[in-house]
């Protein structure tokens, strides 16, 4: 499992969008018991804080201490620094295991073996992510896609391709439940977009190699198209893989 977000942990916590309530509703409808959940690669606890409203106990793990330090604190969430592939949890512990926007960084065979070990019989595994945002303005969206594909494109890690493929390229050796299509819809000003772009691992890779931030020049260009404090509807496509019985095919 790779740690790609320690350096920008505070930015990640502030500017990453929340997942839609309908996604959680569907996951809960397909979970037999709401006792104990594991949110793996929790980041800043975005998913864990929602699960905590429904489960007696949520264990939230991440490989990054800085991410854990920036995580939201809730009484029934227990945070710890652990990898996805090897944990200290007991066998048959969890009713639900979730991974949000992170499984593309995992060693899949080892993670799935760990899932098999720590999941209760008939537990649910839910894995989801979101891809590039679409700003509801054709000119701005064209510039944003160009920034993603061309300016920062060479600086994305190889694993990013799994996001672009909506996880179709990631093995999922369990019986899948057909899932609806979801989206994250936000109303953003330009400052929010700037913060989100600065949370990208590709942005940090670019800075390390070139000594300057590519987002700065992009935002200067955007200011000719996007007025200060002007609100734009922005949509992130969300994709979900879900299994209820965790039987290896």
Label every model-predicted segment.
Residues 110-122:
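A short glycine-rich, Lys/Arg-flanked "PGG" loop and its adjoining helix->strand segment in the class I
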Residues 4-17:
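Class I SAM-dependent methyltransferase Rossmann-like catalytic core
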Residues 121-186:
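Conserved catalytic/acceptor-binding region of the Class I
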Residues 85-96:
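A short acidic, Gly/Pro-enriched loop at the edge of an enzyme's catalytic core
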């Amino acid at each position: 499992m790779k740690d790609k977000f320690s350096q920008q942990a505070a930015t990640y916590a502030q500017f990453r969008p929340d997942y839609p309530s309908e996604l959680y509703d569907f996951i809960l409808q397909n979970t037999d018991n709401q006792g104990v959940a594991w949110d793996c690669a929790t980041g800043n606890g975005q998913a864990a804080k929602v699960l905590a409203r429904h489960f007696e106990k949520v264990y939230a793990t991440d490989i990054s201490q800085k991410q854990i330090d920036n995580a939201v604190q809730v009484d029934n969430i227990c945070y710890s620094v652990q990898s996805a592939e090897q944990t200290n949890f007991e066998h048959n512990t969890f009713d639900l295991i979730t991974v949000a926007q992170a499984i593309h960084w995992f060693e899949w065979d080892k993670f799935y073996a760990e899932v098999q070990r720590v999941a209760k019989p008939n537990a649910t595994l839910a894995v989801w992510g979101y891809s590039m945002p679409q700003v509801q303005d054709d000119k701005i969206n064209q510039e944003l896609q160009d920034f993603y594909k061309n300016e920062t494109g060479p600086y994305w890690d190889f694993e990013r391709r799994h996001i672009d493929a909506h996880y179709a390229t990631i093995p999922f050796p369990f019986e899948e439940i057909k899932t609806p299509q979801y989206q994250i819809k936000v109303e953003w000003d330009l400052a929010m977009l700037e913060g989100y772009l600065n949370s990208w691992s590709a942005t940090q890779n670019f800075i390390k190699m070139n000594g300057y931030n590519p987002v700065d020049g992009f935002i200067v260009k955007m200011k000719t198209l996007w007025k200060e404090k002007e609100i734009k509807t922005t949509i992130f496509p969300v994709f979900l893989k879900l299994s209820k019985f965790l039987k290896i095919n």
